[in-house]
Amino acid sequence: ARGHSALVLTNAMQPMQRPRIKSGLLGLREAHGKRLVIRVSLDHYGRVLHEEERGPDTYDKTIEGIDWLARHGFALAIAGRTYWGESEESLRDGYGRLARERGWPIDVNDPAQLVLFPEMDLSVDVPEITTACWTILHKSPSEVMCASSRMVVKRKGAANPVVLPCTLLPYDPAFEMGATLAEAARADGGMFASGAVKLCHPHCAKFCVLGGGSCSA
């Protein structure tokens, strides 16, 4: 209603495919069109490696869910992983073949439509982000997702949702910004300064700043 866009994360499996959820999604698509983007976690374009991560009989169900979303005109994105050491070019080619076969409206060469996540190993040392990084990398702090976006999560069993800086930090309580977007805009102290996020987490350096990744749709 205010001109914002929303990126909804899902595995597109049975919970999303319930009639009540499908009906709600169709209503949201009708109201918001392409400003609503559904990003589906498909760890690998092939069944074997996807199910190595997600478990047996998960691949077909996810494909079925993406097929439904594509058939009903949703703006789509895919989240894959680079865990197996396959090159980015090979991964994008593989997802591209799958998208063409299924008729999914996804440009696999667009890093926002096919996000390939590196492994987030917190035991690995990463360089600290300094002000000099922005000049060296020819980047601006405003380009990082948490400069202009927030993630809202309703955890199982929780009474209220929680606002977080981004999709990479769903479980770290130090990065919880409040229960509403208004509270998040005022978050101060710890990892925040008047609603702004301090880039102190290892994922900030490895993926967003030095890695050049983006979760934004």
Question: Which stretches of residues belong to each language-model region?
Answer:
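Short, surface-exposed linear patches
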Residues: G3, R29-A31, D60-I66, A99-E101, ...
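Short, flexible loop/turn motifs enriched in small residues
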Residues: G33-K34, V144
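Radical SAM enzyme [4Fe-4S]-AdoMet core and its adjacent flexible, acidic
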Residues: D43, R47-V163
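Canonical radical SAM enzyme core domain
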Residues: A1-A31, I38, L42-E64, Y83-S90
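Short C-terminal domain-edge/linker segments immediately following a structured domain
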Residues: T10-M13, I38-S41, D67-A75, V108-P111, ...
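Short, conserved loop/helix-junction motifs that constitute active-site signature segments
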Residues: L26-G33, L69-G73
